[in-house]
Amino acid sequence: MSAYLDTLKFKLAGTILAAALVVPASVAMSQQNPSSQDILNALKPKPPLTRSLSVSPAEQAKKAEQDKFVDTLRNRPTRSLSMDDRQQIATVAETRPRIDLEIKFDFNSANIAQSAIPDMNSLGKALSDSSLKGSTFVLAGQTDGVGGEEFNQDLSNRRADAVKRYLIDKFGLASEHLVTAGYGKSRLKNKNNPSASENRRVEVVNMADR
């Protein structure tokens, strides 16, 4: 019986390890009430796994095109972004350091809830860190799946703008380094439960990759 249990434990451990290894590296971290250090660690560009592999000309051209696109976003109002712009932001963000924050707002409002102020201050402190100096950040507003598309799109725009204003007013962050984008209910994190609280979030992306 002991040998059987040892074998079973070994197989179970192997299964857990295999499951951990298949989690995509690009999946955004998500935390409730993260510290400023948690946010900073998530947003710091990760060093390449190896320095021996050279970047192909095609990859260099792709990165240059993405960086050029990011430059065009600075100081643009959230509502000026087209659907294609928002999709391109999401595509670039897939490979960049990012974190999902459940920033709470008043019901059907862009007013940041008092209970969310500690999280906002943690975010502001992290983005003010000298190690992130010069980075451009995307603040992507997301809503849950309750309500109409037009309403949620507008609400996500206003909530992303509210987060940006707070960071500028309270932490003196440069406006041109904070890009806001609203996605409404188009990118639900929990598609099985559209009304789930984790769908109401702000995704913060460091558009730098090194």
Model-derived segments and their meaning:
Residues 2-94:
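N-terminal targeting leaders that direct proteins to extracytoplasmic destinations
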Residues 21, 92-96, 130, 171, ...:
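Sterically constrained small-residue positions within well-ordered secondary structures
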Residues 38, 68, 115-122, 150, ...:
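Extracytoplasmic/secreted proteins, especially bacterial periplasmic and envelope-associated proteins
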Residues 62-63, 98, 109-117, 153-156, ...:
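Solvent-exposed, acidic/flexible segments
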Residues 87-93, 105-140, 164-169, 204, ...:
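Periplasmic peptidoglycan-binding/anchoring modules of Gram-negative envelope and division proteins
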Residues 97-103, 108, 133-135, 174-176, ...:
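Envelope-exposed proteins and targeting segments
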Residues 103-111, 146-151:
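Short coil/turn segments at secondary-structure junctions
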Residues 142-210:
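Periplasmic OmpA-like peptidoglycan-binding domain that tethers envelope proteins to the cell wall
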